[in-house]
């Protein structure tokens, strides 16, 4: 029984070209023979979806199929004007290559004379919170591959030239039959370069590039956070045989700070004050990341955990004219190692204290006493 092309792709009869292509791409990736070696069922499914897509992607063939079904492509069907159009191995390989070429940067992949883009590089950098606040220009040294100046990147000994690979005619790819269709693979004669180097450059050993440490200047903007990535285009490894260089990615991390904790653009810190300052009121100074000293007033009767907000004293937001706030939490320090006189004064203070001085604690113990007395009754 012949397959229904729409069912093979898992689409409706009203599916547009975009839906057809997406369905084919998904199924082709699933059933591709390279992913399912020695699996006849996967090969059969792969052939079915290829046949279905090749028919439905063509408006004329699709119209004929919608009207006459498979009879449109049988001998004599439609006056012999249509075939199944599968075109053997080469036709399907072209379809597959066209679609999946888009996933690899658009269009069909060709070695373009063996040129290869250089690899991207990663560099990890740690900065202080102060540097993240103000921004900085950092000098880094990066070991990387650069174009060989002896052979200008050709890989061939000066005075000689690479020759075109006869196996792939310079494309770097060869077509190989695999069952009912053919696929392109890297040329084994030149390893995908498209060229053969008979006399390699002695400095780079035919690679077209050498390893060297480079010094680069990196601008770190104010407001960066953990994981911020900076891209330096063209500062990665040199390309091969005239190919473009890769990029360098700087991954930034911010060191933990001794006093401040960060949450987005806001900063948090704890400031210890004495019990008497909390009770009588007072003030203290706090150093902020902009280098200034900010005076904070403590009102009488300040409780432990009280939070003060200093607007605009937090972190700048990356590439925006916005700054977060600084939140200061009060940490009341209980006195230790009391002298005899200090103890006497505190004991006297305790005797003079009333419920009005400590309403929360007085109310709590009163409620607790009433609770347990009620249980005993």
Swiss-Prot record:
Kindly give the InterPro entries that the UniProt entry links to this protein. Answer: DnaJ, DnaJ_C, DnaJ_domain, DnaJ_domain_CS, HSP40/DnaJ_pept-bd, HSP_DnaJ_Cys-rich_dom, HSP_DnaJ_Cys-rich_dom_sf, J_dom_sf
Q: Where are the CXXCXGXG motif repeats?
A: 148-155, 165-172, 187-194, 201-208
Summarize where Zn(2+) 1 binds, as residue positions.
148, 151, 201, 204
Q: Where is the J domain?
A: 4-69
Where does it primarily localize? cytoplasm
The record lists Zn(2+) 2 as bound by 165, 168, 187, 190
Outline the residue ranges of the record's CR-type zinc fingers. Answer: 135-213
Coiled coil where? none
Name any Gene Ontology BP term. Answer: chaperone cofactor-dependent protein refolding
Report the SMART domains cross-referenced here: DnaJ (SM00271)
Q: Which GO terms describe its cellular component?
A: cytoplasm
Q: Name one GO molecular function term.
A: ATP binding
Protein's cellular compartments: Cytoplasm
Q: Which Pfam families match?
A: DnaJ, DnaJ_C, DnaJ_CXXCXGXG
Obligatory cofactor(s): Zn(2+)
Record's keyword terms, sorted:
Chaperone, Cytoplasm, DNA replication, Metal-binding, Repeat, Stress response, Zinc, Zinc-finger
Q: How is the cofactor bound, in the record's words?
A: Binds 2 Zn(2+) ions per monomer.
Q: What does this protein do?
A: Participates actively in the response to hyperosmotic and heat shock by preventing the aggregation of stress-denatured proteins and by disaggregating proteins, also in an autonomous, DnaK-independent fashion. Unfolded proteins bind initially to DnaJ; upon interaction with the DnaJ-bound protein, DnaK hydrolyzes its bound ATP, resulting in the formation of a stable complex. GrpE releases ADP from DnaK; ATP binding to DnaK triggers the release of the substrate protein, thus completing the reaction cycle.
Q: What is known of its domains?
A: The J domain is necessary and sufficient to stimulate DnaK ATPase activity. Zinc center 1 plays an important role in the autonomous, DnaK-independent chaperone activity of DnaJ. Zinc center 2 is essential for interaction with DnaK and for DnaJ activity.
Q: How does it assemble?
A: Homodimer.
Q: Which PANTHER family match?
A: CHAPERONE PROTEIN DNAJ, DNAJ HOMOLOG 1, MITOCHONDRIAL-RELATED
Q: Which family does it belong to?
A: Belongs to the DnaJ family.
Its name, as the record gives it, is: Chaperone protein DnaJ
């Amino acid at each position: 029984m012949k397959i229904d092309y729409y069912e093979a792709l898992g689409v409706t009869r009203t599916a547009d070209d975009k839906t057809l292509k997406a369905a084919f791409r998904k199924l082709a990736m699933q059933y591709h023979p390279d992913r399912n070696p020695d699996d006849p069922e996967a090969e059969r499914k792969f052939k079915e979806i290829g046949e279905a897509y090749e028919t439905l992607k063509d408006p004329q063939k699709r119209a004929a199929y919608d009207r006459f079904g498979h009879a449109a492509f049988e001998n004599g069907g439609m006056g012999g004007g249509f075939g199944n159009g599968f075109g053997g191995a080469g036709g399907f390989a072209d379809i597959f290559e066209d679609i999946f070429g888009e996933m690899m940067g658009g269009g069909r992949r060709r070695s373009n004379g063996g040129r290869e883009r250089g690899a991207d590089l990663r560099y990890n950098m740690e900065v202080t919170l102060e540097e993240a606040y103000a921004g900085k220009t950092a000098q880094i040294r990066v070991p990387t591959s650069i174009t060989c100046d002896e052979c200008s990147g050709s890989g061939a000994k000066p005075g000689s030239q690479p020759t075109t690979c006869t196996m792939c005619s310079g494309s770097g790819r060869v077509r190989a039959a695999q069952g009912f269709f053919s696929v392109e693979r890297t040329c084994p004669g030149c390893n995908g370069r498209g060229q053969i180097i008979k006399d390699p450059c002695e400095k780079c050993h035919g690679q077209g590039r050498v390893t060297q440490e480079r010094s680069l200047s990196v601008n770190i903007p104010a407001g960066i956070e953990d994981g911020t990535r900076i891209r330096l285009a063209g500062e990665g490894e040199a390309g091969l045989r005239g190919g473009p260089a890769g990029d360098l990615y700087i991954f930034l991390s911010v060191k933990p700070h001794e006093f401040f904790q960060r949450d987005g653009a806001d900063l948090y810190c704890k400031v210890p004050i004495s019990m008497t300052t909390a009770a009588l009121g007072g003030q203290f100074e706090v150093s902020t990341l902009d280098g200034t000293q900010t005076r904070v007033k403590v009102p009488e009767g300040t409780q432990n955990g009280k939070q003060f907000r200093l607007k605009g004293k937090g972190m700048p937001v990356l590439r925006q004219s916005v700054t977060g706030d600084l939140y200061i939490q009060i940490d009341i320090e209980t006195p230790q190692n009391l002298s005899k006189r200090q103890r006497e004064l505190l004991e006297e203070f305790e005797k003079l204290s009333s419920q009005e001085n400590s309403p929360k604690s007085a109310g709590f113990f009163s409620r607790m006493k009433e609770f347990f007395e009620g249980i005993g009754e």
